[in-house]
Amino acid sequence: MSIYNPKSMKAEEFINDVEIRETIAYAQANKNNVELIDSLLEKARPVKNGSGVTCAGLSHREAAVLLACEIPEKVEEMYKLANEIKLAFYGNRIVMFAPLYLSNYCVNGCVYCPYHMKNKHIARIKLTQEQVRAEVIALQDMGHKRLAIEAGEDPVNNPIEYILDCIRTIYSVHHKNGDIRRVNVNIAATTVENYRKLKEAGIGTYILFQETYNKKSYLELH
C-alpha cells in the first residue's frame, strides 16, 4: 500500500486514495465541531507584519472540515474571512482570462466530455497559426489581456510542438490595444521535459483539472 506523501513524484503517493477517504471521513466527523472550526478560522486569518501580510494556511484536512461545515453562522464567517484574505493579498480587483480552444481532437473516452473519441456528432477542428492569430485579435478587441489555451489530448494532432507554436503565435500578436500579457495552459498531463518547454515558452499558469479523486469513479468515467 502506498503511503501518502505530498512531496512525492509518484502520483499514487501524493494523490493517495486512502488519505482522500480518511480526509473526507475526518471532515464529516468534525463538520459541526465549533471549537475546531473557530481555531481553523483563526489560523487562516491573515497577519500584517513588517514585510507585508502573511497567512499560516491550512492543511488539506483542515480545509476539508471547513468545506463540510453546515453551521450557517460559521459559513458566513468563512465568506467574510475569505474576502479579508483576498483583499489582503490581491486587493480590490478581479483578474479574468478568456478561453481559447485550439483543437478538439482527443484520443480519450471521458464520458462527461463532448470531445471524447467516440463522439461522431461533432466536427474535429484544429486551428492553424493564422486562425490562432485571428482569434487573439478578436479577444484583444474585447479587452482581454490574459488567455487560457485549451486542447484535447491527442499526441498526433496536438503534440507539444503544436502547443508551443500556438503560445509563440499568441505572444507575437501586437494589436491596436497592446498584446496578450499572460498565456495559461490547460492541456493533459505531460512529461517533465515538456513542462520545462512550457515554462521556457513563458506560460503563466499550467492548469490540470482532476474531475474526481474517487478512484472507482475515475476508472468508470475515464
Residue ranges and their predicted role:
Residues C55, A82, C110, I149, ...:
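Conserved, mostly hydrophobic/aromatic
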Residues E62, A98, N104-C106, S217, ...:
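Solvent-exposed, flexible loop/coil residues
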Residues M1-L100:
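Flexible, acidic/Gly-rich N-terminal and inter-domain linker regions that tether
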Residues I15-V18, H60-A64, V75, Y112-P114, ...:
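Generic detector of short, locally flexible boundary/turn motifs and exposed helical patches
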Residues G91, V95-Q131:
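Canonical Radical SAM [4Fe-4S] cluster-binding loop centered on the CxxxCxxC motif
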Residues E73, K80-L81, G109-V111, Y162, ...:
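Surface-exposed beta-strand edges and their flanking turn/coil or helix-capping segments
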Residues V65, E73, S103, V107-G109, ...:
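A broad, structure-centric signal for solvent-exposed, well-ordered loop/edge residues
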Residues M117-H222:
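Core AdoMet radical
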